[in-house]
Amino acid sequence: MARIAGVNIPDNKHTEVSLTYIYGIGRTTSRGLCERTGISPQAKVKDLSEEQLDVLRNEIAKMVVEGDLRREVQMNIKRLKDLGCYRGLRHRHSLPVRGQRTKTNARTRKGPRKPIRK
């Protein structure tokens, strides 16, 4: 297994798909990476040479991925909470942030139903 950005990516998959195992890289980004580095998206990772893997590692090192990206997202949410803005309050109360209805649905965000106290 090749190790890129601290993640073991599978050898037996296409490069385009294998790169999506890295947090912060989806299909579109991985396709763009392959295009910029001159690596075929359909090539299997096990068929790539060490030089090609180094080029991929260098290109990914320029991006914000994995732990840095997770930290950045958490800091953005913390900033919203500290500001006390509407979105921050929604995060704080574990409610949907982007305007979805909450009278019905939103169970994933709100958690299991709580019994009504009389």
UniProtKB/Swiss-Prot annotation:
InterPro entries: Rbsml_uS13_C, Ribosomal_uS13, Ribosomal_uS13-like_H2TH, Ribosomal_uS13_bac-type, Ribosomal_uS13_CS. The keyword Electron transport does not apply. One of its GO terms (biological process) is translation. Residues 91-118 are annotated as: Disordered. Belongs to the universal ribosomal protein uS13 family. Located at the top of the head of the 30S subunit, it contacts several helices of the 16S rRNA. In the 70S ribosome it contacts the 23S rRNA (bridge B1a) and protein L5 of the 50S subunit (bridge B1b), connecting the 2 subunits; these bridges are implicated in subunit movement. Contacts the tRNAs in the A and P-sites. This is Small ribosomal subunit protein uS13. It comes from Hahella chejuensis (strain KCTC 2396). The gene is rpsM.
